[in-house]
Amino acid sequence: MTKKIITLLSTVLLFCNSLFAQSSGTDTFQLEKNTNGHYIFKTKINHQLMATIFLESGIHVMLIDSLYAFENSRHLNLDFVKTKRYERMNLGGRKYKITHKATGTIQLGDNTKYSGEIFVLSNYHSGHDMAIPIQRISHSNDGAHIIKLDMKNYRLQVLNRKLFSSEPTNYNTITINYDTYQNMPAVRTDLCFKHKGKRYTLSGNFVLDLGNASFLFLMKQNPAVQDFLKNNTELKIQTAYNKKGVPVGEAIVAEQANLCKKSFKQQIIAITSALPKFTTEGCIGLKFFDGSISVFDFDKHEFHFQ
């Protein structure tokens, strides 16, 4: 009898430890680079449906391809409402029709969830099923919006407050603000760069945009950018092309660049008019994060980076 009780207690303890580990741990998502230089990861949605997810922060809602959404509506468990008027969403200059909207929660792992608005886009399938803004992802244990982006090992983790407290302290820190189009996360800093032997500085507010595969986009419609270009006519501005050879904007080749007091060599600073509603001076892209570890504490408005 005693042996049975001990066995039962051991089983209960193992079960409780398993539950504790699931509720207090973190999910690790392995990132893969697609052909356009962006990052995706695969996970099981709501513990049952596999999905390929596009890593983003330059959007304000979750996006789902229409075909994927309706083929898997039962597993997604969302009430999609058809849009009453013609609506489009501009993603990097390409516009998609918004067919339906929903509000809800999507479980991305044992300890990770997305809560908020969800847009269904027509013909959005481009090697992924959905896109998720990291600022809307939280830990299921305490609801913390703390995202660790490890671009040394290409991993994404969602931390709770306790896990974050055990992180190394050798980070640089800058304040995140949301004074942007659609409240996207941004930082106020100086862009300093060297071009043709001369040094230039542009102060501004820059969106932290993980959907931008480049180093930096400057917004051509922004008054500060316009003044900067007008006052520095000696800058050699070249036509920028995508991988297919199609012109997509203009660019400045910088021998050296400094952004958020972080130094870089040989970077392309793109200038675009494809995002006319953006109000910031620019968007910081993925090449800023290459080979380093960053932590976004969206609750405390802090961006920690190495």
Put a short name on every predicted segment.
Residues M1-T26:
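Bacterial Sec-dependent N-terminal signal peptides
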